[in-house]
């Protein structure tokens, strides 16, 4: 579960030091989980939940944010507000050309 997938689009590999996506807590979780992250620069932030097939389940953050420590919550629902089934999900932080993805487990 500690596997981290990171991808920086474009030539600038230094972006990795400007953003940090932490492990969600709790993990595994039952109904709610917190996702914390740090921005060292301001930017348009997206945090998206995906199923293991890469389908978007829910976008929980999509806004310009100032630098600092941040937290987002996911209540195990999709974009329509419907509960999702138990299983493994991915969550991704995107800021500019930076993208980092981690896994989480929903138990019911």
Question: Which residue ranges define each predicted feature?
Answer:
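Glycine-centered coil/turn sites that cap beta-strands in beta-rich domains
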Residues: 4-50, 59-63, 71-74, 95
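Methionine-biased hydrophobic packing positions in alpha-helices, especially
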Residues: 52-53, 104
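Short, acidic, Ser/Thr-enriched surface-loop or helix-capping motifs
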Residues: 51-52, 78
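C-terminal tail/sorting-segment detector
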Residues: 6, 64-67, 82-108
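Ser/Thr-centric signal marking residues that sit
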Residues: 33, 77, 101
């Amino acid at each position: 579960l500690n596997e981290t997938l990171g991808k920086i689009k474009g030539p600038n590999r230094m972006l990795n030091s400007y953003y940090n996506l932490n492990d969600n807590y709790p993990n595994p979780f039952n109904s709610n989980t917190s996702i914390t992250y740090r921005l060292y620069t301001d930017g348009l932030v997206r945090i998206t939940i995906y199923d293991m097939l890469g389908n978007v389940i829910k976008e929980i953050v999509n806004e310009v944010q100032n630098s600092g420590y941040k937290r987002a919550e996911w209540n195990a629902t999709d974009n329509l507000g419907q509960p999702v089934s138990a299983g493994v999900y991915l969550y991704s932080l995107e800021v500019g050309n930076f993208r980092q993805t981690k896994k989480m487990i929903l138990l019911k």
